[in-house]
Amino acid sequence: MQRLAMDLRVLSRELALYLEHQVRVGFFGSGVGLSLILGFSVAYACYYLSSIAKKPQLVIGGESFSRFLQDHCPVVTETYYPTVWCWESRGQTLLRPFITSKPPVQYRNELIKTADGGQISLDWFDNNNSAYYVDASTRPTILLLPGLTGTSKESYILHMIHLSEELGYRCVVFNNRGVAGESLLTPRTYCCANTEDLEAVVHHVHSLYPGAPFLAAGVSMGGMLLLNYLGKIGSKTPLMAAATFSVGWNTFACSESLERPLNWLLFNYYLTTCLQSSVKKHRHMFVEQIDMDQVMKAKSIREFDKRFTAVMFGYRTLDDYYTDASPNRRLKSVGIPVLCLNATDDVFSPSHAIPIETAKQNPNVALVLTAYGGHIGFLEGIWPRQCTYMDRVFKQFVQAMVEHGHELSNM
């Protein structure tokens, strides 16, 4: 019995020494394991550098605008390196709202009245401590338009404001009716085809600071609205330039892409519930003209638009609304310099619907098309908490237009 106990102790000690050795050496200490790790790392790095990290495709209608961007907005000619562990479209799209920081911004709210008796909520960042533009009357103003159900609290809006603050600029965020907590005074919300509210906001802001450089930037649906406005008004706008990000160019193609099973599960259904939530709190305003019970049963953005948006804005059919809402139709009429950043892997805006040929025919338009980036993603760096590629494009472009925009008229 004593012998057996001694043998067990010896066996236990030997086993413990063996396990300790394995822990110390581990997988990485194994020649085979280390070779596998190194081999995989080299193969992945080669794949990433050859197939993922690429320079954007530039589609610019005019030689003057092309030279201007190369000289003053070089980021659009540089290789975009998506986050190495998250470069796929859906991953970038889903991760950005959760991983990017939210710089603190103190707003001043203003409610302006509309011709139909409604009101629009504007959130101002006045930047009164600007060291570069002490005189408020000439301080550059950037009008920011958030996405579908977005407000001034979105992280991408906060980052644009933070970058504008560094440049000394003032910002104002255009919150669509009823989404920012303000009361809805009339039975009307918003859509990207109807530009009346945006026209009122542009006129109002310009009337306050007529001597200040005035630019606009729109994200997703905000960019669609901005492009539709510019396409309708041409060069007769107080805006000197504009930028759009992750715009859906063809509403039919966007809807079809978002209705594919995985995209519907990840994005479409959630956004539909957000739209329903935004109108539910104002339900009493719509009951006379819209069947709200059917609206609340919608399972997709298309169904919501058919039962609510198209009806509210007087379209005969959903197809009529989607045709009018698609900014690709009006791109040829844009009359001021506009930079449009899209990722060709964006499931919200499929690449085949990007109006490349139309852009080539308008000297005021520049399309910047990255291979990756998703929808309002454009994450870069190992831990993409701070600035994205989209942010860098925004900052360089607005600075270029404010400081060197006069060169375009001389080219």
From Swiss-Prot:
Location in or out of the cell: Membrane
A GO biological-process term: phosphatidylcholine metabolic process
Tissue-wise expression: Widely expressed with higher expression in liver.
Transmembrane intervals: 25-45
Keyword Transcription: no
Keyword tags: Hydrolase, Lipid metabolism, Membrane, Phospholipid metabolism, Serine esterase, Signal-anchor, Transmembrane, Transmembrane helix
Annotated knockout phenotype: Mice lacking Abhd3 are viable, fertile and have normal behavior.
Catalytic site positions: S220, D346, H375
Membrane topology summary: Single-pass type II membrane protein
Cellular component terms per the entry's GO annotation: membrane
GO MF entry, a single one: phospholipase A1 activity
Record field: catalytic activity: a 1,2-diacyl-sn-glycero-3-phosphocholine + H2O = a 1-acyl-sn-glycero-3-phosphocholine + a fatty acid + H(+); a 1,2-diacyl-sn-glycero-3-phosphocholine + H2O = a 2-acyl-sn-glycero-3-phosphocholine + a fatty acid + H(+); 1-tetradecanoyl-2-(9Z,12Z-octadecadienoyl)-sn-glycero-3-phosphocholine + H2O = 2-(9Z,12Z-octadecadienoyl)-sn-glycero-3-phosphocholine + tetradecanoate + H(+); 1-tetradecanoyl-2-(9Z,12Z-octadecadienoyl)-sn-glycero-3-phosphocholine + H2O = 1-tetradecanoyl-sn-glycero-3-phosphocholine + (9Z,12Z)-octadecadienoate + H(+)
InterPro entries recorded: AB_hydrolase_1, AB_hydrolase_4_CS, AB_hydrolase_4_sf, AB_hydrolase_fold, ABHD4
Main location: membrane
Domain AB hydrolase-1: from-to ranges: 140-233
EC number(s) per entry: 3.1.1.32, 3.1.1.4
Stored Pfam families: Abhydrolase_1
Function noted in UniProt: Phospholipase that may play a role in phospholipids remodeling. May selectively cleave myristate (C14)-containing phosphatidylcholines through its predominant phospholipase 1 activity, cleaving preferentially acyl groups in sn1 position. In parallel, may have a minor phospholipase 2 activity acting on acyl groups in position sn2. In addition to (C14)-containing phosphatidylcholines, may also act on other medium-chain-containing and oxidatively truncated phospholipids.
Family under the similarity heading: Belongs to the AB hydrolase superfamily. AB hydrolase 4 family.
Entry protein name: Phospholipase ABHD3
Originating gene: Abhd3
